Amino acid sequence: MLNYYSTKRKKKTLATYGAMMKGYIKNNMPNQAIDLFYKIENPDKIIIMFVFNACASLGTSEALDLTKKTLEKMPKTFYSDSYILCSVLDALMTCGDVKYAESIYNSSTNKTLPMYGAMMKGNPLILIIKCINRASTS
């Protein structure tokens, strides 16, 4: 159904792409969500968050590369969005780049509980304890 809709509709909006990407991710089809992402010229916050979620679902080195490239191109204003940061941390941790995730986490001024959870993914126990200790002292 999603594929039929995406091929028949002439002009797609960001909302359309977002709904389709969310559907693909929810139905365990992250590669299709990423394929859609490549078709979008100017993604908004929601689209970028979905591509990070798709990358986290894959957990591959290719997904890590896409996460980093998207992060580089992402407007700096998006860095203050805790939902996007949580998705970035989830993707980085799931794809295995703990150091980069830690640097983003440590530079964030507004740490949220979901961000703590994302940092726990794939992180050795000792690093989790350090994160909790840092959080309690800040």
Where are these regions (language model features)?
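Alpha-helical tandem repeat RNA-binding modules
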Residues: M1-S138
